[in-house]
């Protein structure tokens, strides 16, 4: 018997508290080697598509969706009794949505047309996987500090900086049973944590359903992520709803951190 088969898996050791997840790269229409596929199936409670659900990959041409890689991952999760995370409806960074989103023939699309496309995209994606994806990263990486407090993108330029409110309300209407996440990075930085908490609180005060704050944790030794998680829990409807969406920890003082981190 191989050593790894004699040891308990990560998901067995965690016992669901917390759920252990990983990202999966599937946009080329296949998973990994049999050994890697077995690790994905046995070690993790949840899987998240790394890129294939992002708008620019999923629908590079208007009306032409590439659902096959996403279907592959969702089917994989279903077979292995894993949760699947929807990542992401809107990534607030230029280059993370298709160019056609802002074009109307030979001219720039107005806000009305862009909103219609956003709503159509959310409906097509969330409706297709309703009941199979129970948690959606609705908005990814909106906050920027200092001023103006948000990352300026083509989306904020065309739709306005208040577009997240309408986006969350659209998502809640399409799939009322899904958990909705506001995802951001560097929550261990006090200035960013303060801005993220204020942003989430303001949206919830406006009637937005936000069940989870997701932390993309690109950490170095000494980052105080524990206090960041406690801070996030102050604004959530129930305790414990800060989820780590990404996690890597580096020690910049160790020259060999990259190969050793990779090996780990």
Regions found by a protein language model. Give the residues of each.
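Acidic-and-aromatic substrate-binding clefts and catalytic sites of carbohydrate-active enzymes
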Residues: 3, 23-34, 55-68, 143-147, ...
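Glycoside hydrolase catalytic-domain groove-lining segments
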Residues: 75-83, 157-183, 190-264
């Amino acid at each position: 018997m191989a050593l790894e088969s004699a040891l308990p898996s990560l998901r067995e050791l965690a016992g669901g508290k917390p759920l252990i997840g990983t990202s999966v790269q599937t946009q080329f229409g296949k998973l990994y080697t049999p050994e890697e596929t077995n690790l994905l199936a046995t070690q993790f409670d949840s899987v998240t598509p790394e890129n294939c659900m992002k708008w620019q990959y999923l629908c590079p041409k208007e009306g032409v969706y590439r659902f096959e890689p996403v279907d592959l991952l969702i089917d994989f999760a279903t077979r292995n009794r894993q949760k699947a995370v929807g990542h992401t409806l809107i990534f607030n960074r230029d280059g993370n949505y298709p160019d056609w989103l802002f074009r109307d023939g030979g001219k720039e699309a107005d806000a009305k047309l862009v909103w219609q496309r956003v709503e159509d995209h959310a409906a097509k994606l969330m409706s297709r996987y309703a009941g199979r994806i129970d948690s959606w990263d609705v908005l990814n990486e909106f906050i920027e500090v200092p001023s103006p407090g948000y990352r300026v993108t083509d989306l904020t330029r065309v739709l306005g900086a208040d577009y997240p409110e309408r986006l969350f309300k659209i998502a809640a209407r399409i799939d009322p049973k899904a958990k909705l996440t506001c995802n951001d990075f560097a929550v261990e930085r006090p200035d960013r944590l303060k801005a993220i908490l204020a942003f989430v609180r303001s949206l919830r005060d406006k009637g937005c359903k936000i069940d989870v704050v997701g932390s993309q944790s690109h950490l170095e030794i000494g980052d105080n992520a524990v206090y960041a998680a406690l801070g996030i829990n102050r604004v959530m409807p129930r305790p414990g709803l800060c989820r780590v969406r990404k996690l890597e920890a580096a020690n910049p003082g160790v020259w060999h951190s990259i190969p050793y981190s990779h090996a780990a």
